[in-house]
Amino acid sequence: MNNIIHNDAPTPWGIYFQDGASPVYDGIVELHDQVLFYLLIVLVGVSWILFSTILRFRGSGIVHKYHNHSTTIEFVWTVSPALLLIAIAFPSFKLLYLMDEVIDPSITIKAIGHQWYWSYEYSDYTDKEGQSIEFDSYMLPTEDLEEGQLRQLEVDNRVLVPVNTPLRFIITATDVLHDFAVPSLGIKVDASPGRLNQVSTYVQREGVYYGQCSELCGVLHSSMPIVIEAVSLEKFLSWLDNQ
């Protein structure tokens, strides 16, 4: 049996994406790779033309009479970028539409940004006292971390969600602008006071996914981590029963 280790948190000197756990995230990575491929082609092509021209005409004093004007060249360098932008725009717009679409979520979780912590509310469920399940989530101080926990990324209360279930997050704030961002799930949404923003996701595998507030919100901006733990439906229902 093969054990696969997923990268669901920032790593030192990391230069690429974290491992994905949602369809939207996979689409983001695929679009990035496609655009990067196009950019490399442009870089190589333009660099080749530039350096070949420099090497050919350096110091010779020769001026080609057709280099002052060429309808063919102007047509090529006008149409080629237009076609390239169209090739990038269509998959980009498609992905943006899919990211904004919320289709019949099974669970809705409200995330509220504060200076400097997050609070969460499971509006669809109630605790033993008949109140909506809600809690605050603060960053764990360094001295309280256990072995294997991540500094400035671990919290005292994680958001628990079931895998393979349509989820919706409703995001807002009470004071200043914040930003709810979980890279491995492809989530990044502004948390604005007096405004409700929403985003849907579908977690494909169990794991612990780390994020942070991604909007400069004050002196303790870096102390607003987000931790989403995806578990099986059975474990999630058991957690609900214990609330």
From Swiss-Prot:
Disulfide bonds: none
Ranges of the Mitochondrial matrix topological domain: 56-74
Superkingdom of the organism of origin: Eukaryota
Localization in the cell: Mitochondrion inner membrane
Binding site for Cu cation A1: 178, 213, 217, 224
UniProt binding sites for Cu cation A2: 213, 215, 217, 221
Cofactor note: Binds a dinuclear copper A center per subunit.
Reactions accelerated catalytically: 4 Fe(II)-[cytochrome c] + O2 + 8 H(+)(in) = 4 Fe(III)-[cytochrome c] + 2 H2O + 4 H(+)(out)
EC number, as in UniProt: 7.1.1.9
Assembly: Component of the cytochrome c oxidase (complex IV, CIV), a multisubunit enzyme composed of a catalytic core of 3 subunits and several supernumerary subunits. The complex exists as a monomer or a dimer and forms supercomplexes (SCs) in the inner mitochondrial membrane with ubiquinol-cytochrome c oxidoreductase (cytochrome b-c1 complex, complex III, CIII).
PANTHER family: CYTOCHROME C OXIDASE SUBUNIT 2 (PTHR22888:SF9), CYTOCHROME C OXIDASE, SUBUNIT II (PTHR22888)
Protein name per its UniProtKB record: Cytochrome c oxidase subunit 2
Species of the source: Pneumocystis carinii
